[in-house]
Every structure is written in structure tokens, then in C-alpha cells.
From Swiss-Prot:
Homology family: Belongs to the SCC4/mau-2 family.
Coiled coil: none
Subcellular location, record wording: Nucleus, Nucleoplasm
Assembly and oligomerization: Interacts with Nipped-B to form the cohesin loading complex.
Name the record gives this protein: MAU2 chromatid cohesion factor homolog
Transmembrane spans: none
UniProtKB keywords: Cell cycle, Cell division, Chromosome partition, Mitosis, Nucleus, Repeat, TPR repeat
GO cellular component terms, semicolon-separated: chromatin; nucleoplasm; nucleus; SMC loading complex
Gene Ontology biological process terms in this record: cell division; chromosome segregation; maintenance of mitotic sister chromatid cohesion
Length: 639
């Protein structure tokens, strides 16, 4: 065959490829898409015996389309595996990396574990060392999988490698993304000194070495979210305020109408085509951390307002595209709502919203959300059971929570509430055992100031019930010192009302009044119906002792009002079909029916009688926001 004939044949073949690809794209973008004909056009390419690179790319395209538009996972896997086997040995051919990334995603969807996905990505990472873009993208994807499997050290190591690679390539923006992602992982690992060092390093680079103002603002939001979560994890509600205010201002800047689209900001340079979360999801996340702060500070109205806005925004985004991260945000918000409802004495709404959180978890593919949030749900049901005096159920729920979670703060929180149950049911041996265990586990370790304040409160409560009033005062003053230092208003109000009861018990009515008055003022602001009920009972006794009949009558009327409200709510709660959740101890939670939930808010409770309610700590039962916080993905693939 002559050279001219060969050239003509090749040109004709190229024309066929282009025509078939164009036709396939036409069918894919039709309204509605005609995926069957699209696939047929791509399949027809193979009849021309195309070169290896064209064949591999076509198999990749078919796998992509089948994954995106159909349920035919097996056929998608076949084409992707074919693309991988052809492309893997070919040098300077990016199709292998795209294929490996997609195959890893497919393995995660279909396999019982992530081993194959990790193996595929490790091989691709090894092959991509001379391609900075793909090397970094694959490192992020592999780190994400290790983080999801709670293999935090491996995830951290991969992110450190990514930061080094980005630095060597002069990709400063990408380097900061790796540094902040690693700081997030270290935060989950409780490596506080390392977190601070990384945040400081990243903060300096953001301030001094990011010339693009829009990318700088995005990085600042990522940085501030981590900084706020860091302080909240420590229970430092007062310390975090300046950072939270900065974060709220930054997100308003990003959400302004004149702000460029994410495509414009991140689409110019290949090594800048990475974002942590798109701005619409960042907006929800900022609401979420604001809710968490409002709860810890004891501002229920603010928490409710921000939760309503966040849930509304989530529903809007779900209508556009139902990303998995939105369900994570929703579950965490509902977990907050539930605790808030119980603080305010709305247990019937609380159990409804626990059921709503259960529904979101059950709807997620492969029960992935339920696996992550099962311990939190058991903890919430334990709190609900406790508040409705189902103590045996509450105990079992907390024990399940402790056995299921590796999160130290959640375990501490559940154990402190178990201590309250043992105190209330007069199980002194169990109480001593759990207090000793909590003390030994948390003496030399990083813990939330709010939770440690709660621990001192429980010890004060224990001393009060033993009539060891001097010891009770010592513990409660320590609690107050911690609570006042960081504006933990609910912990303050609970400690003050218990301290008032201590002084009342030893006949010091003046000091008792000095304690109960600010306790009631704080409780009305929160509002915390349990502290109000308890405080009104103390006030009634104090006014009776001082022979102030009118004030005694007023205090009694208030006490009666709070009591009647709680009794009425208790009746509605136990009659609700969702109350059946108190009997869920293993497996999938039962599906219950009932009226739909309203958009609402979240927190935690004590009880009406002598200081024996759940631990007065406004602390999220969510795992430190780690579900909401995730390593960055490439723009257009926010996984």
C-alpha cells in the first residue's frame, strides 16, 4: 500500500472516530439523554480496531457514562477495568489515572470494604509521580478513604507527602489545602500541638503568599472553620468568638452576588482546580459551627434561628443535586436540635427529630451514615429516655454508645450521664466505678473544658447526695471557674442552682439566694426549663423561710407552671409512636411513623428534681464535626 493510500485511510478512520464521538455526545446531551444510543456509538468505535490509546479512552468514556447515567455497575466495571489494563503500561497517558480514580469510587460503592479501592489508588499514586496534578489528586482521594476508615495516621502521612509535592511544584494554593486538610486529620487524632503548628504555618502562607484575592478568601474560610472547630472542641466558647466573627464575615464576602463563580476562580490553572467545599456548602457549614457555638454558650434562640436557616439551605441544595455531604450536615444539625429541644423541655419534638435523623441515616447508601452516627443516635435516645424517667432504657442506650464509639469526648459524655443514672438509682458501686474510670482516663489527656466542667459538676452532685456539703462546694466552685472563664452559660446556671441547694441544705439562706437568683436569670435566657423548675422550688423554700408569703406564692405558681408543662410534654412523648426507639439496642433502628418534624434546634438537659438530670454540658454528640469536615476534592468532584 502506498504512503498516500495509508494516509488517506488513517484520515478516513480519524473522521469516523470524530463523527462517532460527536454523535455519542449529541445523544448524551439530548433532552432527555439517549444513553443507549450514546453507548452504541462508542461501542461502534471498536469495530475500526483503534490504537491502544483511543481504545483505552473509549472504554473510560463508556465506564464514566454507565456510572453517571445507569445502574449497570457490572458493565461500567468491565469497561473501566479494560481501560486500566490497556492504559497502565502506556507512558505519558493520563487516562490510566482518571480510570484508577473512577474504579476506586466504584469499588467503594460496591465492595464490602475499601481494600481494593486503596490498592488501586496506591498503584496509581506510584505511577503518577511525574504528573503533579494527578499525583496530588490521587493522594487526596486515597487520604479521604483512609480518613473515612479512621486510619488517620496513614491519611496524615499522605497529606504530608502531598504538601511536599505541591511545594516542590511551586503550587502554593494547593500546598495550603494539603496543610489544612492534614490539620483537620490531626485535630481528629487530638494532636493539639501539631494542629496549632500547622494552622499557624498555613495562616502565615495565606496572609503573605496567596496573590489571588478570591482563592485567599476561600483558604481563609477553610482555615477559620478549622480554628473555630479547634476551640469548640476544647470547650472554649469565649476564646473562639473573634475567629467565629471573622468566619461569618468571610462567608458573607464569598456569598455576595458580585463574587465570581467557583469555575472562574479555580478553572484557570490545573494545580488550582481543587477546592475543599463549594461556597454553597461552606455557607451551610458556617451555619453549623455557629449553631454549635450558640448551643455551647447557651443561646437557644440563636441556635434555633441558625439551624432553621441551615436546614432550609440544605433542602435548596438537595433539590439542585443531592450530594452525600448534605445528609451529613443534616444529621449533625438534627443531633443538635434534639439536645436543644430537651433542654427546653420539648421531649416530644426531640424524639420526633431523633426519628428524622434516623431516617436520613437509613436513606444513605450502604448504611454508611448509620455506621458513623449509630453511637450518637444511641446517646440521644439515652438522653431522651433519661429525661422521661426510663432509666433502664437510658442505661442500655449509653452502654451501647460507649461500646460503639471510639470518640473519646462522646464516650466521656455518655459515661457522665451513666453516672447520673447510677446516682439517681442509688447504685453506689457502679457510680464509684464509672467516676474512677472517667477520672483515670481523662486526667492527662486533651478534653473539652465543657466536658471536664461537667465531670466536676457530677462529682459535686455526688458529694451533695452524700451530704458532703463542703466537698460539693469545692467541686462546684471548680465547675463555676471553668464555666465562667469561657461563658458556658448552661454549665454556670446548673452549677449555681446546685450550689444554691447546697447552701439551702446547710441553712445558709443568704448564700442560697445569692446563687439561685443569677441561676434563674441565666436559665430564663437559655431557656432551660429544668433549672427553672429546680430554682423555683428553692425560691419557694427560701421565701417560706423568710416568711415572704407573696414571693413564696409567686415561686410556687412558677414551679407549678414548669411542672405542668413538663408533665404534659411527658404524656405526649410516651404516646408518640417514635417513643418505641427507646427499645432499639442493636442492628438497624426500627422504622416508626408519626407527624412530620418541624424545622427546629438542638441541645442537652438536666432534670426537675434535686439536681439529677443529664450532664449540664452544651456539647455536641456529633464526632467533633469530622463528618462535616473532609479533605479537599478536585473541583467538580466534591466527594
Amino acid at each position: 500500500m502506498s504512503a498516500s493510500t495509508s494516509t488517506t485511510a488513517a484520515a478516513s478512520q480519524d473522521a469516523c472516530y470524530i463523527s462517532l464521538l460527536g454523535l455519542a455526545e449529541y445523544f448524551r446531551t439530548s433532552q432527555p439523554p439517549n444513553i443507549k444510543k450514546c453507548i452504541q456509538c462508542l461501542q461502534a468505535l471498536f469495530t475500526f480496531m483503534p490504537p491502544s490509546k483511543v481504545e483505552a479512552r473509549t472504554h473510560l468514556q463508556m465506564g464514566q457514562i454507565l456510572m453517571a447515567y445507569t445502574q449497570n455497575i457490572d458493565l461500567a466495571r468491565h469497561h473501566l477495568e479494560k481501560a486500566w489494563s490497556i492504559s497502565e503500561p502506556l507512558a505519558n497517558f493520563d487516562v490510566k489515572f482518571d480510570t484508577a480514580s473512577l474504579l476506586a469510587q466504584l469499588h467503594l460503592q460496591t465492595d464490602q470494604n475499601s481494600n481494593q479501592a486503596k490498592a488501586m489508588l496506591r498503584r496509581a499514586v506510584e505511577l503518577s509521580q511525574h504528573n503533579v496534578y494527578w499525583h496530588c489528586k490521587l493522594l487526596l482521594q486515597l487520604a479521604q478513604i483512609h480518613a473515612s476508615d479512621r486510619e488517620y495516621s496513614l491519611a496524615s502521612d499522605l497529606l504530608a507527602v502531598g504538601a511536599e509535592n505541591a511545594d516542590e511544584a511551586g503550587a502554593t494554593y494547593l500546598k495550603v489545602l494539603f496543610l489544612l486538610s492534614r490539620a483537620m486529620i490531626l485535630m481528629i487524632e487530638r494532636k493539639t500541638n501539631d494542629v496549632l503548628a500547622l494552622l499557624n504555618s498555613a495562616g502565615q502562607i495565606i496572609d503573605n503568599n496567596i496573590p489571588n484575592p478570591h482563592q485567599k478568601e476561600y483558604l481563609k474560610v477553610f482555615f477559620l472553620v478549622l480554628q473555630v472547630c479547634y476551640y469548640l472542641a476544647l470547650g472554649q466558647v469565649k476564646t473562639v468568638k473573634p475567629s467565629l466573627k471573622q468566619l461569618q464575615m468571610s462567608i458573607q464576602t464569598i456569598m455576595a452576588p458580585n463574587w465570581p463563580s467557583d469555575e472562574t476562580i479555580f478553572g484557570a490553572n490545573q494545580l488550582e482546580m481543587f477546592v475543599w467545599l463549594p461556597k454553597e456548602q461552606l455557607y451551610v457549614l458556617v451555619y453549623l459551627v455557629t449553631v454549635s457555638h450558640s448551643m455551647m454558650a447557651g443561646y437557644m434562640d440563636k441556635a434555633q434561628k441558625y439551624t432553621e436557616k441551615a436546614l432550609t439551605q440544605i433542602e435548596k441544595l438537595k433539590q439542585q443535586e443531592d450530594k452525600p455531604i448534605l445528609s451529613v450536615f443534616k444529621v449533625i444539625l438534627l443531633e443538635h436540635i434534639v439536645m436543644c429541644r430537651m433542654v427546653m423541655g420539648n421531649r416530644e419534638l426531640a424524639i420526633r427529630e431523633i426519628a428524622a435523623a434516623r431516617d436520613v441515616c437509613l436513606a444513605a447508601p450502604q448504611r454508611s451514615l448509620l455506621r458513623r452516627h449509630s453511637a450518637q443516635l444511641h446517646c440521644l435516645i439515652g438522653l431522651y429516655s433519661m429525661s422521661t424517667s426510663f432509666f433502664e432504657h437510658a442505661e442500655r442506650q449509653f452502654l451501647v454508645c460507649v461500646s460503639e464509639t471510639n470518640e473519646r469526648d462522646l464516650k466521656l459524655f455518655a459515661n457522665l450521664n451513666l453516672a447520673i443514672i447510677y446516682l439517681r438509682t442509688k447504685r453506689d458501686t457502679d457510680l464509684k466505678q464509672i467516676l474512677d474510670a472517667v477520672s483515670s482516663e481523662n486526667t492527662n489527656t486533651y478534653s473539652s473544658q465543657a466536658l471536664m466542667g461537667g465531670f466536676y459538676y457530677v462529682q459535686g452532685l455526688h458529694a451533695f447526695h452524700k451530704n458532703s456539703f463542703h466537698e460539693a462546694k469545692r467541686f462546684l466552685r471548680e465547675t463555676l471557674k471553668m464555666a465562667n472563664a469561657e461563658d458556658l452559660n448552661r454549665l454556670t446556671s446548673c452549677s449555681l442552682v446546685l450550689l444554691s441547694h447546697v447552701f439551702l441544705s446547710i441553712g445558709n439562706s443568704k448564700e442560697s439566694m445569692n446563687m439561685v437568683t443569677p441561676a434563674m436569670q441565666l436559665a430564663s435566657k437559655i431557656p432551660d426549663i429544668h433549672v427553672q423548675l429546680w430554682g423555683s422550688a428553692i425560691l419557694k423554700d427560701l421565701h417560706r423561710m423568710s416568711k415572704d408569703a407573696q414571693h413564696e406564692k409567686d415561686a410556687y405558681a412558677n414551679h407549678l407552671k414548669y411542672s405542668e408543662n413538663l408533665i404534659a410534654d411527658q404524656r405526649k412523648s410516651v404516646q408518640s409512636s417514635h417513643h418505641e426507639l427507646v427499645n432499639w439496642f442493636h442492628g438497624d433502628p426500627p422504622v416508626t411513623s408519626g407527624p412530620p418534624t418541624t424545622t427546629a434546634v438542638a441541645m442537652i438537659l438536666p432534670d426537675s428534681s434535686a439536681a439529677v438530670g443529664p450532664v449540664p454540658v452544651i456539647a455536641s454528640t456529633s464526632t467533633g464535626m469530622q463528618q462535616a469536615i473532609q479533605p479537599v476534592g478536585q473541583y467538580g468532584q466534591f466527594y
